[in-house]
Amino acid sequence: MTLSDAVAHLSPHRWARANRLLIRKALAEFTHERLLSPEADGEGRYTVRSDDGLTRYTFTAVIRALDHWQVDAESITRHRDGAEVPLSALDFFIELQKSLGLSDEILPVYLEEISSTLSGTCYKLTKPAVPAAELARADFQTVETSMTEGHPCFVANNGRLGFGIHEYLSYAPETANPVRLVWLAAHRSRAAFTAGAGVEYESFLREELGGETVERFHAVLREQDLDPADYLLIPVHPWQWWNKLSVTFAAEVARRNLVCLGEGDDEYLAQQSIRTFFNRTSPTKHYVKTALSVINMGFMRGLSAAYMEATPAINDWLAQLIENDPVLRSTGLSIIRERAAVGYRHLEYEQATDRYSPYRKMLAALWRESPVPSLREGESLATMASLVHVDDQGASVAGALIRQSGLTPVEWLRRYLQAYFTPLLHSFYAYDLVYMPHGENVILVLKDGVVQRAIYKDIAEEIAVMDADAVLPPAVERVRVDVPEDTKLLSIFTDVFDCFFRFLAANLATEGILAEDDFWRTVAEVTRAYQKSMPSLADRFRQYDMFAPEFALSCLNRLQLRNNRQMVDLADPSGALQLIGTLKNPIAGF
């Protein structure tokens, strides 16, 4: 690849298109979060003015449930000094810096994230457009690598600060380029391997790597007069080796606490979360999740060595809870367990930092089960994020699945809700247990376009038990969190209603497939059906009212605009919430 080839996707027409799409999203989501207050000009047309009042953006929009602004990208125009001027996302954030609450310190870093997001969109625009109907029938990894929007709420959602253009082209999930992981030997005095029930280190590594590869790696150690029995093997993202470990952990390499063994044989595909890899060579083998010290959507994407120690136990506990609960079992819910984990402690950095520091999250990995072996005849897999994916003609994958299924839109939706939403309700009301159930964290099992069951993932880092009195095994105690009573239900209202159903309902309504009222009526009916089936939890249903008239608006972009390097204090995540006013509960009237 030549120097100019690396930026061939950055053409004027693609850049203009990417800017228009991003400004559309910014107008919609920042208005939703009440950072912007568009002036109505009549007939669905609105104006937003810059901080100095000299620039104005005009556009048409439909306002839907949950104060969702569906902005028409083609309608957006920008005017200054009486003349129309080209759209520029970077200018947009500078012109509205004060309105958006961007400090002088954060602004340039945020602009860098916006530039990276725009560049990523330009790359995606070079790929042939895949119709939603085709994606609805595509294989698991084709769907995964075809996602174009990223998180539906966050505007700067593809920052990946730390990736150069060559690394973007090598490792970004949308490029779908196969990756071989780097393997290190880590001295047992600094490293720890933990695993779930029935998993033993030596046999597990041989199953994942193959006996020949393990022997090859051991030979590298023996050639340096090192004993393989003194070391644990750790998979590493290639970027992390080249950019961090080879420099930041130089002392560990020099002391032979870390030894680079080379690349593994299997080829992997990066998933939407960037640092997790699917085994393309052997799809039934485990995913590998690695530490990656790039900034993306408000966090450095490292992995804590300390957190890894309890990860398998937490997954085993949740899997057992699901297995023992007849309601969860009846929905078909499962998790793909994080079966094993390994972490490396750099003693000097630990002395110099607190437990939340990125320096403690540079070298760790976990192995997560593949969902492929669980498939039955005729079933396929798709990231739930695909439901809100819209192709270049405005057609959604959810709409395509409904057409493929032959079911009425309401019946299709009901089956999806019973598979995905009912388990969330029951986990909350029966166990005070919550997940992070956004589109990228859920895999749907489909058959003939119909959702059969849901698979939740990213368990140990994301689940929480909000009951101070719940009896938990010592190894699982970490998931207990203290959350104010009045914000507990935001785990449903924000994470599910506002951050996912809001977009799904709007897309189906826009396509003329399912009216918004019918969408939310169905959500209400599924909720009431669950509650009716569980009379023993009636007091809980009253205490935490799913049919309350309104709920607090929790703003995600405000977190990132305030601090895009670490948008949540990990010591007090609920305390970081940006609650701005309320939203009308769309199921309250049903």
Predicted features by range, described:
Residues 432-445:
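A short glycine-rich, hydrophobically flanked beta-strand micro-motif that places a catalytic Asp/Glu
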Residues 426-431:
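Protein kinase catalytic-loop region centered on the HRD/HxD motif
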Residues 421-425:
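Short C-lobe core helix of eukaryotic-like protein kinase catalytic domains
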Residues 1-419, 446-590:
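Nucleotide/phosphate-binding site architecture used for ATP/NTP-dependent chemistry
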